[in-house]
Amino acid sequence: MGRFIFISFGLLVVFLSLSGTEADCLPDWFHYEGHCYRVFDEPKTWADAEKFCSEQANGGHLVSVHSRKEAGLVGVLAYQTLESPIVWMGLSKVWNQCDWGWTNGAKLKYEARAEESYCIHITSKKKEWKSLPCRNYGHFVCKSPA
């Protein structure tokens, strides 16, 4: 367990040193590859979290993940900040269709979900994607363009 925390912390330090805090991100937001990220420790339903993210930054949404590297970053940020296993992402069923879609309109290119349901959260420790009813409360990560 101690080694896992040490490695996770090391990854976070590497991400921080490579990305830094850009002037284009709001205070307390983390910059990475042209986007700003922030973990919020305020449990909300998925819809309330998405609304909150859109109010925090121009173009803000619940986090969308498009690569294994970005998934690792989000998992490390969430794990270092939160004790909760539930961290909402911006992936959900779109208007009762069979298609999954990101709240920012981006196409789904990368996924690691464990099962289907309504809204997806990332487990902060294992960094796996799982589904829960959207009415459940969870912490969340917002993402916006830098």
UniProtKB/Swiss-Prot annotation:
Membrane-crossing ranges are: none
Domain spans labelled C-type lectin: 32-143
The record ties this protein, via PROSITE patterns, to: C_TYPE_LECTIN_1 (PS00615), C_TYPE_LECTIN_2 (PS50041)
List the disulfide bonds in this chain. C25-C36, C53-C142, C119-C134
Expressed in which tissues = Expressed by the venom gland.
Answer whether the UniProt record assigns the keyword Signal to this protein.
yes
* Compartments it resides in: Secreted
Asked if the keyword Disulfide bond belongs to this entry, the reply reads yes
Superkingdom in the source lineage: Eukaryota
What InterPro entries does this protein's entry cite? C-type_lectin-like, C-type_lectin-like/link_sf, C-type_lectin/snaclec_domain, C-type_lectin_CS, CTDL_fold
Signal peptide start-end? 1-23
| GO MF annotations, alphabetized | toxin activity
Q: What Gene3D superfamilies does its record include?
A: Mannose-Binding Protein A, subunit A (3.10.100.10)
SMART domains listed in its UniProt record? CLECT
Other facts noted in the record for this chain: Shows greater sequence similarity to the beta than alpha subunits compared to other heterodimer snaclecs.
Tell me which family the UniProt entry assigns to this protein. Belongs to the snaclec family.
The UniProt subunit note reads as follows: Heterodimer; disulfide-linked.
Its function, per the record, reads: Interferes with one step of hemostasis (modulation of platelet aggregation, or coagulation cascade, for example).
Q: What name appears for this protein in its UniProt entry?
A: Snaclec 1
Give the organism, scientific name. Bitis arietans (African puff adder)
